[in-house]
UniProtKB/Swiss-Prot annotation:
GO MF annotation terms: rRNA binding; structural constituent of ribosome
Gene: rpsH
Protein name: Small ribosomal subunit protein uS8
Oligomer and partners: Part of the 30S ribosomal subunit. Contacts proteins S5 and S12.
Protein keywords: Ribonucleoprotein, Ribosomal protein, RNA-binding, rRNA-binding
Highest rank taxon of the organism: Bacteria
């Protein structure tokens, strides 16, 4: 059976891994998943990530905890294959009053909602992380 939405699968694996207090989660790798992981690491939501293997690369995300609680309280897919969500730079959402981020796919690559607003770019809203 083929996977219909690999990004939703990635976010679900991270959510389930943190709910089960796992140290790391593994999943099939893609360029978009690696870009999302890099953004989450830069924003401080995950500890680290690595791509392993040549023929079938796997993405391993090391999860981050603070005082035995997951750093990611909420991770939610917004734009999906059946319903794409696009916003202009002045209409980009602020997640939890600025405490969270919205991952936005712009013409300049993947970035947080704050960075996209600062650059004056809109795009597809991939997910919310808080």
């Amino acid at each position: 059976m083929s996977m219909q939405d690999p990004i939703s699968d990635m976010l679900t694996r991270v959510r389930n891994g943190q709910a089960a207090n796992k140290v790391a989660v593994k999943m099939p790798s893609s360029k978009l998943k690696v870009a999302i992981a890099a953004l989450l690491k830069a924003e401080g939501y995950i500890a680290d990530f690595a791509v392993e293997g040549d023929i079938k690369p796997e993405l391993e995300i090391t999860l981050k905890y603070f005082q035995a609680k997951p750093v990611i309280e909420q991770i939610q897919r917004v734009s999906r294959p059946g319903l794409r969500v696009y916003k202009k730079n002045d209409a980009l959402p602020s997640v939890m009053g600025g405490l969270g981020i919205a991952v936005v796919s712009t013409s300049k690559g993947l970035m947080s909602d704050r960075a996209a607003r600062k650059a004056g770019l809109g795009g597809e809203i991939i997910c919310y992380v808080a």
